């Protein structure tokens, strides 16, 4: 063994060994349980960042740990490779998106391999490869045939800078999440998936995910946004253009007697009839244009001024018969409920602000109990609390929460309304007017209409030479040789769909492809997905809580219904790791606070980078980058190396690796000879077994990687104490070898390269990852001595070390002999002595 820890030579050596021997190529052995460990695959931007290092280091600890525990472990990696950045690079650098993407993949693969991550690279997938997107297209067709994919004209989120449509989830505070441009509304023919058909199942089945963070489940629950209410019909006083009523959705039917106006979203389908030929038509259309230029977020924000315009029309309250003025307003969205809202200004703050601005009457219909009666003349804000109904006809006197059902009953009985469950979730818009995505496999024929591309004609391949000028249409429209085709049904002239799919479609099923990545004839083989699914541990950022995780759950449920998979949920357990920060903020190039993983690995080694990032914070918390912390992790590995080096010659003469407790005792000898050891040797055994127990539980039960590493560091500290305290000739070398073996084995998932090298020194022969995970003996965890806290009248006054297991009377006697105790109780009478064995003595005096 060389004296100096040469991390560069060691890491290259073992990375080559793992590659040459196929160490992490999946070996599916019968009789072993399966474990599918998966980190969210990255977009191939070209370089890893520290966030990548963190998530992949976490996953690698879990995968290596489970491998050593005897599982068949599936631990794959791939690339979420379609997307707009490749097109932007094509425009900027004059390089085809495919070339840019594959070059980035090659570089990032090399970087991942330099980290020593235990991926089975034979299962690598890239969503931009025709062998992959062929099956993305095939899955689209399965949804299409099941009636879950459809095309319609819709007001969509349009990013003028990206010149493409965005899903609702890709609009953040009214801005494009990719380029921060203000998002506009635009009416286009678009493709959708009917995710709303699965809204209730997506909501209910969150209860089947105890291994998911509550925060993520709450985010999905809020995004699905289930509510229960009624749809009530307000007849138009003067029907116009075929419109004779306006239907509202409300969860507050208890306030229906307090309606004093009606509001429509400017996009509501009845608006054209109300506006056309209206004496105020020009004014109304100008207002509509103004509102449609605003983002939905801005329109509904609490601090946005509520703006509206009276249409000149009235409708009739279905329960009071009163005339209600119909307004258009910016704060009502067509996509939620029916796009029509009843205004109850006395009991809704938003309505109160609107009514105050436009001098609309208010009517109190709920009086709070135990408080002075509300008077609309004196109200400066809406009353939104509970109380008894007033001015509500036959329902006066009812508690408003009780009135919800009886008023719904009356509306249904009179045919003026129906109970309704509503969801905030909208259907998933998957069309993108971009090139670098999976082409939608549909052909349009003048004779046959919309025709699905037959399976045998998949994949619909992307052409390689297209124009990338943002125009609002897909760049594929510049290639007649792509879109001009033959109708597969009638043989006539056809035109291909030129939109491509949202990249989230590609990532909604990749975990299934990993089960059978090379199969040319199937998206995945049934027997393989039946064996591997669902994913036992999924790891990735909480920023994907709504988008990717919701879509992956939807896809899995659809495939379950189509009898293509046997699981309804894709991910059994989910870990959402925190961000890597510098100076309290997320690392980013724009802030100039990034750290290059390549530079850290070159300077300190991959094991140091991994160890620091796993030790610095619990995985679910944000991690503050620290150069000193990195240097500390590096010093620890040097210290470990020197420790093994110091014993390398002596342990070489001891056969085996873990040799048990007594000198020369074979592996597996139990506690029958434990207490024949001297106290120093017993403490070495205790520390070794405690560390195994602690690391096993911290990885296997809690994912507390930071405390596991801390326990390993403490074991090294004790080892140095043992080495310095016990004379060399009295040191129990078989026990030293046993303890070093356990130390290296439990560190192996965290720092794989150095542990491979040290395992060879200890005498392991085979790779450390061919070894079983070490066990521990509970009897070995017992300390020789324990610390007893001494209290007087409940206050801690002293501490005493006594033999473990010493009986209570003997402990009391020792406590009463202590000088400090005698001084404190002098002149007082002892009323009671309370003893908690091995922990505490409390002396009660007066």
Swiss-Prot record:
Localisation per UniProt entry: Cytoplasm
Pfam families documented for this protein: Anticodon_1, tRNA-synt_1, tRNA-synt_1_2, tRNA-synt_1g
Sequence motif 'KMSKS' region, residues: 586-590
Keywords attached to this entry: Aminoacyl-tRNA synthetase, ATP-binding, Cytoplasm, Ligase, Nucleotide-binding, Protein biosynthesis
Superkingdom in the source lineage: Bacteria
Binding-site residues for ATP, renumbered to this chain: 589
UniProt motif ('HIGH' region) ranges: 42-52
Record-linked InterPro entries: aa-tRNA-synth_I_CS (IPR001412), aa-tRNA-synth_Ia (IPR002300), Leu-tRNA-ligase (IPR002302), Leu_tRNA-synth_edit (IPR025709), M/V/L/I-tRNA-synth_anticd-bd (IPR013155), Methionyl/Leucyl_tRNA_Synth (IPR015413), Rossmann-like_a/b/a_fold (IPR014729), tRNAsynth_Ia_anticodon-bd (IPR009080)
Molecular function per GO: aminoacyl-tRNA deacylase activity; ATP binding; leucine-tRNA ligase activity
Reactions mediated catalytically: tRNA(Leu) + L-leucine + ATP = L-leucyl-tRNA(Leu) + AMP + diphosphate
Claim: Signal is one of the keywords in the record: no
CC per GO annotation: cytosol
UniProt EC number: 6.1.1.4
GO biological process: leucyl-tRNA aminoacylation
Membership in a protein family: Belongs to the class-I aminoacyl-tRNA synthetase family.
Name under which the protein is recorded: Leucine--tRNA ligase
């Amino acid at each position: 063994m060389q004296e100096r820890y040469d991390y560069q030579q060691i890491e290259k050596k073992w990375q080559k060994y793992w590659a040459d021997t196929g160490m992490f190529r999946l070996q599916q052995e019968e009789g072993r349980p399966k474990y599918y460990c998966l980190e969210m695959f990255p977009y191939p931007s070209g370089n890893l960042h520290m966030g990548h290092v963190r998530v992949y280091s976490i996953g690698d600890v879990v995968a290596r740990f489970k491998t050593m525990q005897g599982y068949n472990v599936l631990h794959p990696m791939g690339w979420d490779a379609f997307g707009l950045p490749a097109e932007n690079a094509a425009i900027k650098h004059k390089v085809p998106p495919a070339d840019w993407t594959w070059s980035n993949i090659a570089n990032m693969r090399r970087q991942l391999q330099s980290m020593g991550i235990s991926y089975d690279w034979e299962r690598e997938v890239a969503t931009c490869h025709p062998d992959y997107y062929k099956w993305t297209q095939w899955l689209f067709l399965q949804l299409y045939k099941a009636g879950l994919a459809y095309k319609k004209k819709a007001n969509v989120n349009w990013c003028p800078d990206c010149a493409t449509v965005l899903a609702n989830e890709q609009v953040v505070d009214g801005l494009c999440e990719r380029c921060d441009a203000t998002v506009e509304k635009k009416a286009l023919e678009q493709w959708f998936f009917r995710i709303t058909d699965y809204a209730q199942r997506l909501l209910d089945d969150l209860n089947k995910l105890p291994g998911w963070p509550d925060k993520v489940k709450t985010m999905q629950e809020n995004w699905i946004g289930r509510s229960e209410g009624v749809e009530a019909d307000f007849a138009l006083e003067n029907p116009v253009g075929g419109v004779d009523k306006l239907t509202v959705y409300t969860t507050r039917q208890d306030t229906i007697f307090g309606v004093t106006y009606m509001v429509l979203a400017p996009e509501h389908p009845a608006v054209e009839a109300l506006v056309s030929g209206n004496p105020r038509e020009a004014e109304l259309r100008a207002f509509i244009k103004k509102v449609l230029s605003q983002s939905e977020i801005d329109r509904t924000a609490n601090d946005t001024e509520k703006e509206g315009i009276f249409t000149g029309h009235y409708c009739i309250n279905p329960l009071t018969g009163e005339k209600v003025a119909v307004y258009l307003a910016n704060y009502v969205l067509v996509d939620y409920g029916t796009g029509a809202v009843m205004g109850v200004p006395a009991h809704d703050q938003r309505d109160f602000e609107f009514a105050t601005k436009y001098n609309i009457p208010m009517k109190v219909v709920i009086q709070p109990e135990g408080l002075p009666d509300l008077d609309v003349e004196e109200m400066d804000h809406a009353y939104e609390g509970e109380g008894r109904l007033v001015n509500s006809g036959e329902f006066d006197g009812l508690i408003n929460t009780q009135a919800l059902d009886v008023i719904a009953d009356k509306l249904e009985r009179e045919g003026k309304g129906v109970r309704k469950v509503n969801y905030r979730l909208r259907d998933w818009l998957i069309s993108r007017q971009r090139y670098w995505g999976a082409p939608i496999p549909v052909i349009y024929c003048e004779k046959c209409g919309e025709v699905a591309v037959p399976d045998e004609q998949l994949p619909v391949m992307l052409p390689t030479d297209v124009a990338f000028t943002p125009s609002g249409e897909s760049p594929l429209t510049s290639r007649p040789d792509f879109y001009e085709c033959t109708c597969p049904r009638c043989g006539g002239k056809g035109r291909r769909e030129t939109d491509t799919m949202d990249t989230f479609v590609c990532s909604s099923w990749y975990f299934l492809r990993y089960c059978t990545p090379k199969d040319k004839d199937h998206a995945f083989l049934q027997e393989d997905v039946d064996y591997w699914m669902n994913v036992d541990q999924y790891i990735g950022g909480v920023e994907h809580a709504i988008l990717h995780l919701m879509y992956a759950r939807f896809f899995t449920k659809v495939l379950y219904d189509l009898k293509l998979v046997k699981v309804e949920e894709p991910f059994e357990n989910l870990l959402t790791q925190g961000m890597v920060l510098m100076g309290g903020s997320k690392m980013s190039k724009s802030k100039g606070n990034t750290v290059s993983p390549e530079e850290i690995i070159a300077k300190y080694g991959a094991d140091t980078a991994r160890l620091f990032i796993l030790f610095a914070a619990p995985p679910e918390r944000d991690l503050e980058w620290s150069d000193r912390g990195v240097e500390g992790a590096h010093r620890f590995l040097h210290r470990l190396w020197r420790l093994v080096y110091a014993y390398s010659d002596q342990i070489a003469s001891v056969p085996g690796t873990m040799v048990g407790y007594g000198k020369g005792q074979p592996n597996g000898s139990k506690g029958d000879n434990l207490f024949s050891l001297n106290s120093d040797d017993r403490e070495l055994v205790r520390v070794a077994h405690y560390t195994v127990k602690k690391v096993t539980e911290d990885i296997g039960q809690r994912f507390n990687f930071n405390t596991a590493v801390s326990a390993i560091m403490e074991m090294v500290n004790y080892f140095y104490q043992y080495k310095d305290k016990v004379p060399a000739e009295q040191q129990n070398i078989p026990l030293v070898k046993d303890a070093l073996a356990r130390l290296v084995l439990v560190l192996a998932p965290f720092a794989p390269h150095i542990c491979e090298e040290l395992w060879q020194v200890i005498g392991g022969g085979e790779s450390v990852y061919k070894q079983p995970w070490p066990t521990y003996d509970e009897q070995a965890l017992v300390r020789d001595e324990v610390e007893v806290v001494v209290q007087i009248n409940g206050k801690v006054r002293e501490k005493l070390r006594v033999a473990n297991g010493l009986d209570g009377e003997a402990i009391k006697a020792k406590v009463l002999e202590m000088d400090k105790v005698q001084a404190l109780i002098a002149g007082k009478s002892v009323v009671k002595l309370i003893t908690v064995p091995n922990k505490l003595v409390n002396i009660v005096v007066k």
